[in-house]
């Protein structure tokens, strides 16, 4: 009998803290059709910048990660830069914000909102 190992490691991790915050924001908007879209654009002090927005529409080729019924959606171009990353929500002395821990980033800026590969 052959036993296959099933890896439960996701390509992109959507943390519990981030999912809870997104759920709260969706409730405030009173629109259960919203997803959190994470994307990457050119710019920032390190070459690429992370972006977050709410979206109601999924586009062809989008990938998604679900945590506690909340969906995180990523376009194909951004996805390739986010493989292995964790999307999290942090509240500390610097304020409250969504952050990305990205193992693909060679350098990041001081605030963590831009990176280079």
Swiss-Prot record:
Pfam families: Fe-S_biosyn. GO terms for biological process: iron-sulfur cluster assembly. Iron-sulfur cluster binds at residues 45, 109, 111. It comes from the Bacteria. SUPFAM superfamilies: HesB-like domain (SSF89360). Gene3D superfamilies: HesB-like domain. The keyword rRNA-binding does not apply. PANTHER family: IRON-SULFUR CLUSTER ASSEMBLY 2 HOMOLOG, MITOCHONDRIAL. Required for insertion of 4Fe-4S clusters for at least IspG. HAMAP family: Fe_S_insert_ErpA. Homodimer. Belongs to the HesB/IscA family. This is Iron-sulfur cluster insertion protein ErpA. It comes from Vesicomyosocius okutanii subsp. Calyptogena okutanii (strain HA). The lineage of its organism: Bacteria, Pseudomonadati, Pseudomonadota, Gammaproteobacteria, Candidatus Pseudothioglobaceae. The gene is erpA.
């Amino acid at each position: 009998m052959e036993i296959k190992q099933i890896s439960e490691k996701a390509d992109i991790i959507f943390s519990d803290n981030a999912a809870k915050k997104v759920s709260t924001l969706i409730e405030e908007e009173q629109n259960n059709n919203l997803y959190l879209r994470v994307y990457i654009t050119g710019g920032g002090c390190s070459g690429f910048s992370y972006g977050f927005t709410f979206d109601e529409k999924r586009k062809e080729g989008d990938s998604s990660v679900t945590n506690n019924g909340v969906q995180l959606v990523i376009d194909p171009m951004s996805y390739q830069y986010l493989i292995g990353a964790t999307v999290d929500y942090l509240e500390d002395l610097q304020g409250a914000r969504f952050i990305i821990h990205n193992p693909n980033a060679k350098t990041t800026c001081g605030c963590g909102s831009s990176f280079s590969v």
